[in-house]
């Protein structure tokens, strides 16, 4: 089975410009392809994870990846799928975020001479002359076609700024530039990027008379059609300081029964034969599948040691074995206690489990908090400082969030 057939079997391919030519290129290690990453935060998240895995798979098959850091396009902001304009970031913020991205990408992709490349589109976009750009590529874009593009669809009623309207042209120019300078012949991206990607292939065809190709990756959606990779508290990050390895593990351990095998197939590197054998699993076997998914993805992102710790901590909570010391924890300072006690509301806020006293109050009143398996029945409950000595206490928020609180 070639790599193209494997990607298809894993459900990763959404749309392609020319299936036969793309199959020929990737199966024979002839694709020099890029995926763009705009630097809108200081960490990659689960939405980027699928793209990184795709790059790794294709590199293992002999193809050459280009990780394009969007130092220039981030200055504009991608309107795809947005209801409002993205927050404008400073150049310093973007440069910092780009450095964070580089460090995380190096855990997945092998960079170096003859291997993967990492480029930053700020190196060419920031120096463009506007008049020259209009003359060089402006005539290749139809405003009528651009206005019909799906990437602008959600913004047309609420207002699309001219700044954002230029995003497609900038992304297309990236492909055009790299096609000429580093032989990049293919672009991959999320299915919501299809219009922007076609802009690039068309620009290359019209300006250079040559073929370039595009393929979109299936969006990671749950059985309800919602994007995966987000929790009630926000995105699931790849940075362990933003989403702990335990919380990352728990996110995947708690996916729905209808989604677990799809996630294993799309995101892990387990052999397809092994995954196909799981298709008949049901009931308690699906819990085993969720453990496999959580462990494999945590190992990919955070390493085997952290995956083992997260799995042990989860089993301690749900199976009555192992140690709880590896779950997320907060050391409470002396100042948090008044007369040797701390209230339930303050405890939740101090541990970052609630953003405010009001949120903590509502959570307790709804019966959503337990400490050491004892439900917190009232907002007036207090805890003695002595209870937090040693391993401390385990706080349970809802059904799936656990946190350890202790004192020095």
Which residues are covered by each model-predicted region?
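Positively charged, low-complexity intrinsically disordered leader regions
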Residues: 1-33
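Divalent-metal (Mg2+/Mn2+/Ca2+)-assisted nucleotide/phosphate chemistry catalytic cores
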Residues: 10, 90-91, 97-216, 222
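A charged helix-plus-loop insertion that forms the helical arch/lid used to bind
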Residues: 79-95
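Short, hydrophobic/aliphatic alpha-helical segments
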Residues: 28-36, 58, 65, 172-181, ...
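Short acidic, glycine/serine/threonine-rich loops at helix termini
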Residues: 77-81, 128-134, 226-232
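N-terminal catalytic cores of NTP/NDP-binding nucleotidyl/phosphoryl-transfer enzymes
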Residues: 21-79, 188-194
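Buried hydrophobic packing segments
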Residues: 51-58, 178, 196-204, 297, ...
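Conserved nucleotide- and phosphate/pyrophosphate-binding catalytic cores
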Residues: 204-408
